[in-house]
Amino acid sequence: MCQATNGPSRVVTKKHRKFFERHLQLLPSSHQGHDVNRMAIIFYSISGLSIFDVNVSAKYGDHLGWMRKHYIKTVLDDTENTVISGFVGSLVMNIPHATTINLPNTLFALLSMIMLRDYEYFETILDKRSLARFVSKCQRPDRGSFVSCLDYKTNCGSSVDSDDLRFCYIAVAILYICGCRSKEDFDEYIDTEKLLGYIMSQQCYNGAFGAHNEPHSGYTSCALSTLALLSSLEKLSDKFKEDTITWLLHRQVSSHGCMKFESELNASYDQSDDGGFQGRENKFADTCYAFWCLNSLHLLTKDWKMLCQTELVTNYLLDRTQKTLTGGFSKNDEEDADLYHSCLGSAALALIEGKFNGELCIPQEIFNDFSKRCCF
């Protein structure tokens, strides 16, 4: 892993490994509310350990049988007895006569099994067609966007769930893992043109993507990653790409140059944020947005490292939000480490080193191996 060039900071690799390992062991009762999010906890932990060069397939491969139990096949009560499948976040959510699988837990589980190198599962066990049919049913026919789950009574896309760029990314990533590569592959299961139309409708006037014409770093990364998986980045105009790059570069907070004069004028300016990235304009820096912004820049231009100050963001992560006592990364320098920010902080550092695939959010070496071994 990378090391800050200025100052004594370095990555406390052993403590980060222990931090992620703790989340795969017995968690305290305060985490009971997250029981339905077990697949997310496993993904963030396995991803973090993989970034820090832990052989997770050797260390946790014995638990693949337990992981596989979360894969549920359901026969819908329709005229065609349609079979769909996906993952539940926890076995307590495997409720008879109710469709409780959802897109996020399905993607978290699939990515975790890729990192655990359970290639036998993808090649011989996973019913990719029924899984793709579930993704298809989550698409809103009127907008082209996706919801995360089905109505447990009607088995149509949930009418109360939100639909946004996050779920569009998750849906396309699942189909990509299932073997979809060309537009024709995706068209077999979803209305790709309508999806592309929805993504384009989320473009903001000053660059980037977001709802209600307010650009957001996380949504921008989701939109660009979705377009990349669909091989459709060329649909963006050169002007929009340039505007988006400019907007993303302006999200890197600096205590140098003109920005230092904001200290008394901007309530959202904090000098200690120097080098970090904010998710929106007039917000404080946040560890996770370092990844979302850097991944977006990486997808837009091969010169991204020359445009942004990677040394400063590295120093920000290592000096400000890395927890040298407990391991992990926090949202900012005032809070404790949490699993989400620890994973994305580690991913940002790995992305700078060229060791992380931002499109699927897994280490590059694992992505390469999966692509080679599982050619559907």
UniProtKB/Swiss-Prot annotation:
Record annotation: effect of changing residue 216 to D: Increases KM for peptide substrate 12-fold
What this protein catalyses is:
geranylgeranyl diphosphate + L-cysteinyl-[protein] = S-geranylgeranyl-L-cysteinyl-[protein] + diphosphate
Q: Which GO terms describe its molecular function?
A: CAAX-protein geranylgeranyltransferase activity; zinc ion binding
Q: Listed GO cellular component terms?
A: CAAX-protein geranylgeranyltransferase complex; cytoplasm
Q: Which EC numbers characterise this protein's activity in its record?
A: 2.5.1.59
PFTB repeat ranges are 128-179, 192-231, 259-301, 310-353
Disulfide bond positions: none
Q: Which SUPFAM superfamilies match?
A: Terpenoid cyclases/Protein prenyltransferases
Residue numbers binding Zn(2+): 286, 288, 341
- Function in brief: Catalyzes the transfer of a geranyl-geranyl moiety from geranyl-geranyl diphosphate to proteins having the C-terminal sequence Cys-Ile-Ile-Leu or Cys-Val-Leu-Leu. Acts, among other substrates, on Rho1 and Rho2 and CDC42 proteins. Participates in a RAS-like C-terminal modification of proteins involved in nuclear division and bud growth. It is involved in bud positioning and cell polarity. The beta subunit is responsible for isoprenoid and peptide-binding.
Q: What is this protein called?
A: Geranylgeranyl transferase type-1 subunit beta
Species whose genome carries this gene:
Saccharomyces cerevisiae (strain ATCC 204508 / S288c) (Baker's yeast)
